[in-house]
Each structure stands twice: as C-alpha cells, then as structure tokens.
C-alpha cells in the first residue's frame, strides 16, 4: 500500500491529463486518487459532471488512464450516482473505488452489486465524513478493503482547513479494527502527517499540499520520507 497518494480534482478533461502527467512521470508514484464530485452530494461539480457528454465519448472510444502497468487509480466518488459513474472509470482502468457512505441509500446492496459485476480484481473502500458516526462503515467492514476518513468538514474541494477531530476518529477506529487499512483525505500537510501515521493511518491522500507547492515533485519527496508503522 502506498504511503503517499497524490489526489487530483479535475476541472476538465485537459486539466485531468495535465495533473496526471505531473505525477505519473514520477517513479515513486504507484497510486493516484481522482476526485469525482457531482455538485449535489458535494460541490462544486468536477469533471466529468461538468461535461457529461465527454465521459460517454471516452468510454465509447475505449480510452484508458495512463501507465496502468505501474499505477493503480483510485476513484473517490463524491456523488449520488456513484454506482453508475463507477463503471465508466473501471472501463478506463481504475482498480480502486471509494464510496461515501452518506451518499448511498443501501451500502450493503451497493457493495454486493459492484462486487458481483466486477469481481475481486477491484478494491472497494468506504469514506466517511468528519461529523458522521463510524458505525455507518463498521457494519460493512467485511465487504471492503480500506476505510477513508475525511480530514475536512467541507468535502469536494481542495484547500480546505484540516479538522483535528479526525485524529480521535482514526485512533479509536484503528484500535478497534487494526486489520483494516486506514487512509485520510483532506487537509493533510506536513504539520499533521506524522501524527496521523502514528495513530494508525496507512495512506495519506494529499491534494492541495502538492498542487499548490512550487515544486510538486519536491513536495512529494518530503512526504515520502515519512515512516509509517502500519502496513506500508
């Protein structure tokens, strides 16, 4: 499992290609998260919700994500129709799907449906908002491979302030379920990364701290020097 996972929030197809090119050229990167925001469950809408016809055209054309031979793509589905949208990203070569429990009416049914259609080659994870009760994910732990705690109160956009409530959420969850990999997404920086790792986080999902750095590659290298005792 990757300790540092760059996250990209695309505003357009062109923006997605440019942001992926920035990270996929780095030898140390073997996993990238793509944020997908529908403008309803979270806002503002990102690509492809900002241009739905483009997504359909890419699926029909058989487009694939770059460097699938060495990079695993994880799709963070901040949308109410995650089941439908997931199929398009899987056709592009994504192998990890993160569903937000608050966006799904019937989580067990969704997970079972996705698993029955796509098998075990994909990794399914559940994300939970900072204000939500972890019981929402705990009843589904047998069907997923990882949990994502949101480190910000307002999801769907990068650059939001880190919410320290996530420290206690992670601590308690990891103590109760040490076998489940935990990742934190939102507000991750060098100021809080070491503490998150010490509490049991396996992967740091990092967006704005890399995107807004003058040198993203150098910023990534600093994060990669961190050490985690939990499965990395």
Roles of regions detected by a PLM:
Residues 45-107:
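Glycine/small-residue-rich loop that forms an oxyanion/phosphate-binding "nest" at active or ligand-binding sites
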Residues 42-51, 130, 136-177, 215-225:
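Glycine/Thr-rich beta-alpha phosphate-binding loop at enzyme active sites
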Residues 24, 59-67, 108-119, 168-178, ...:
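Surface-exposed amphipathic alpha-helices with a cationic face
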Residues 2-8, 30-34, 71-77, 97-99, ...:
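Hydrophobic faces of well-ordered beta-strands that scaffold small-molecule active sites
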Residues 26-31, 94, 144, 179, ...:
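A structural motif
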Residues 23, 34-35, 89, 147, ...:
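Conserved, mostly hydrophobic/aromatic
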Residues 97-106, 148-159, 199-220:
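Glycine-rich phosphate-binding active-site loops on the catalytic face of alpha/beta enzymes
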Residues 16-23, 83-91, 131-144, 187-204:
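Catalytic cores of alpha/beta
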